[in-house]
């Protein structure tokens, strides 16, 4: 089991979880409307391989504080830097999933001495504004209103959405439960408020990830998920990814682009494969 502690600074508390191991350290950063528990199948594998691993709930998420401001990348990147400093992780490899990839990318460009390399898991290379204007993005990508949904219905929804893709073990179920508060009547309420979700979405829409990738000066591995046609999370984004892949490959060193088969929730679907890619990348840049 990881050790847990709460860090407080800049007006927000951050729930941090640590798995033992040695250098090179690894920082795991989750995505939008997720939590540090998305890494629950990956982090133990990294730790067992001898790598010290730290994950945390980003502001607004999980058991961290939920201020009504500070969701731009300057602030969320500073949160990541604060976790690195407080846990004495040195210059870790920073691994971000989805929005978390955009967070660590911005951190590396603004403060490259904080990290030694980046792994961007199905995020950090798309520009939302290439696909949507803001009013459309706000409408299409707004979160569903799940507040008040009975817990059993929510779990049935998860089973349906991930059918044939991820086995819903007690560990996986716990990941999804970490995203919700359950009231006395057995109904769920998302821990990330709709208002804060939209604040983050706006920051994502405004960020130019491709321009940041051109400016990054650290070894960077982009792991883009190639979803099968018809899977729920392919939803038009495969064409967007294909176009972005071409643009990213023109950047060249130190940015490397690779496809990996799976679904967007890769840390749950293929934790062993993902942990292996992270370990090999970290070992290569250490030497």
Language-model-detected regions and their locations in the chain:
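Alpha/beta-hydrolase fold catalytic core
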Residues: 1-26, 48-51, 89-90, 245-247, ...
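Hydrolases whose catalytic domains are alpha/beta-hydrolase-1, hotdog thioesterase
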Residues: 103-107
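Flexible "cap/lid" loop of the alpha/beta hydrolase fold
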Residues: 109, 116-150
């Amino acid at each position: 089991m990881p050790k847990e502690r709460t860090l407080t600074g800049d007006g927000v508390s951050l729930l941090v979880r640590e798995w033992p191991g040695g250098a090179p350290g690894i920082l795991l950063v989750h995505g939008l409307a997720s939590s540090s528990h998305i890494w629950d199948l990956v982090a133990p594998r990294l730790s067992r391989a001898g790598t010290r691993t730290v994950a945390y709930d980003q502001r607004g998420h999980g058991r961290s504080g939920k201020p009504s401001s500070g969701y731009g990348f300057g602030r969320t990147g500073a949160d990541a830097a604060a976790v690195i400093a407080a846990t004495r992780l040195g210059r870790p490899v920073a691994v971000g999933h989805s929005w978390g990839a955009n967070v660590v990318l911005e951190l590396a460009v603004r403060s490259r001495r904080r990290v030694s390399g980046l792994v961007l898991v199905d995020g950090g290379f798309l520009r939302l504004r290439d696909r949507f204007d803001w009013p459309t993005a706000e409408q299409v990508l707004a979160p569903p209103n799940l507040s008040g949904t009975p817990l059993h219905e929510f779990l049935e929804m998860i089973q349906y959405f991930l059918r044939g893709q991820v086995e819903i073990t007690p560990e996986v179920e716990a990941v999804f439960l970490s995203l919700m508060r359950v009231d006395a009547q057995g109904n769920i309420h998302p821990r990330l408020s709709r208002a804060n979700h939209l604040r983050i979405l706006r920051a994502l829409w405004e960020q130019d990830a491709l321009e940041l990738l051109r400016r990054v000066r650290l070894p960077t591995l982009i792991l883009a998920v190639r979803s099968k046609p018809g899977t729920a999370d392919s939803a038009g984004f495969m064409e967007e990814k294909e176009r972005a892949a071409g643009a990213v490959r023109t950047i060249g060193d130190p940015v490397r682009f690779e496809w990996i088969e799976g679904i967007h929730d890769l840390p749950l679907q293929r934790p062993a494969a993902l942990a292996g890619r992270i370990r090999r990348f970290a070992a290569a840049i250490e030497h």
